[in-house]
């Protein structure tokens, strides 16, 4: 049995989960998420708990079992609490600012880099070297944060670049002169 798949998901107050065939709809105070799952995996809602089960123990069903449960749990947590990723800009002259609904990054290129947040994701800039990506869909929040980080990933010699808050960047020695 999958260690993740066999855990039940507790539905918090204010969140409703409905099943229509293999499509799950999760509604909560932060928003609504709809996802279609593999029809071979069985999802049962009993009271305020969700159980996920698989038909056989073959490799494909074992993999889908844990994945289905994890995605459902992320949907429930997302619409009730939401997700956020914090990014830091480290480097001389590196700064971020919000212009309307766009995030504008000045990170050492000849031009500013602009990002527009997708529906359900919002970007905050509390300081000019800090960016917070918030939303109820974990996948969209993580993808936008990764795309922002990919503009200027941290380099190992000086540590300059965009990194996640608390991310450890492994540093390297520079070349030594003769």
Curated annotation (Swiss-Prot):
Key words, A-Z? Ribonucleoprotein, Ribosomal protein, RNA-binding, rRNA-binding
Q: Kindly list the GO molecular function terms attached to this UniProt entry.
A: rRNA binding; structural constituent of ribosome
Sorted alphabetically, which PROSITE patterns does this protein's record hold?
A: RIBOSOMAL_L6_1
Entry annotated with the keyword DNA-binding = no
GO cellular component, as recorded: cytosolic large ribosomal subunit
Q: What protein family is recorded?
A: Belongs to the universal ribosomal protein uL6 family.
**Function text:** This protein binds to the 23S rRNA, and is important in its secondary structure. It is located near the subunit interface in the base of the L7/L12 stalk, and near the tRNA binding site of the peptidyltransferase center.
Identification of the protein by name: Large ribosomal subunit protein uL6
Annotated source species: Listeria welshimeri serovar 6b (strain ATCC 35897 / DSM 20650 / CCUG 15529 / CIP 8149 / NCTC 11857 / SLCC 5334 / V8)
């Amino acid at each position: 049995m999958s260690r993740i798949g066999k855990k039940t998901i507790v539905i918090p107050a204010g969140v409703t989960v409905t099943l229509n065939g293999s499509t799950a709809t999760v509604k909560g105070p932060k928003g609504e998420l709809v996802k279609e799952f593999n029809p071979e995996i069985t999802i049962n809602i009993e009271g305020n708990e969700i159980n996920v089960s698989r038909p056989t123990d073959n490799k494909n069903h074992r993999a889908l079992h844990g994945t289905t449960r994890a995605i459902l749990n992320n949907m429930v947590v997302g619409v009730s609490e939401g997700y956020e990723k914090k990014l830091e800009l480290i480097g001389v002259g590196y700064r971020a600012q919000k212009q309307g609904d766009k995030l504008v990054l000045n990170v050492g290129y000849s031009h500013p880099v602009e990002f527009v947040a997708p529906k359900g994701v919002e970007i905050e800039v509390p300081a000019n070297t800090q960016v917070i990506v918030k939303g109820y869909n974990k996948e969209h929040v993580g993808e936008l944060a990764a795309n922002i980080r990919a503009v200027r990933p941290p380099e190992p010699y000086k540590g300059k670049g965009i990194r996640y808050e608390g991310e450890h960047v492994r540093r390297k020695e520079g070349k030594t002169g003769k």
